[in-house]
Amino acid sequence: HLPLSSANSINIGRLLPQSVYYFYAASRLAKPGEPIVFSIPSGNFGDMMGAVVARQMGLPVKKIIVPVNDNDAFPKFLGGGVYQKISPSRNSLSNAMNVGHPSNLARLVAVYGGQMDETGRIGRMPDLAAMRRDLFSSSISDERTRATIKEVWDKYKLLLEPHGAVAWRGFLDWEETENAERGTRSAEGSGFPAAILETANPAKFPEEIEKMMGWSPDIPPAMEITNKLPEDFDRLGADYDKFKAYLLQKHA
């Protein structure tokens, strides 16, 4: 009756537009044909899959870094080859990433030749060697997240929000691993252009920022306008027939 769609992170109609800004970032940061590194704060793995799609479309990508918070099922799987979903998910400061079993993980596993069902059971193992070649993942605790926010502010006067701090620290974890393998010092860096992604504005976390920094972040104009708008909502019970009737009436 109604042309409805869900724009959640397993909808390919969301992943395809997300893949575009990886090309845009590379066009601004890397030379033509030069590989780039992306560090993407990850929960349900939709944004990260946008980077995988971009790579599949031909974008030269050196490494896709997949930092997670305390919901560390993926880095354990990537490192040890055993997947154990986390249920219930663990609460962390980077709350948009509190996902114990990423719904896009099955899609990633399929890209590397494996098969995983919706419960997380693996029917066929992916090519883990290829995944480790292309991907890096580490788990960033709330303690490390807070320390990163302070460190980046002190060093660069750049205010990160928790998800961006997870991405920043994940990038540094990868650099340390790369330098250890090459036997070089951390100050030398990876030698590749890199884009570190954020998912929100620090103003969405005023209490946490004030605890860490002693002051509240500035609220951007667009957010100020939204905050002044009146709330408009209806309450519905968990009843499909009533929900269906509500939609039909609302959009008649």
Protein language model regions, located:
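Compositionally biased, intrinsically disordered low-complexity segments enriched in Pro/Arg/Gln/His
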Residues: R182-R185
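PLP-dependent amino-acid enzyme catalytic core
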Residues: H1-N179, G189-A252
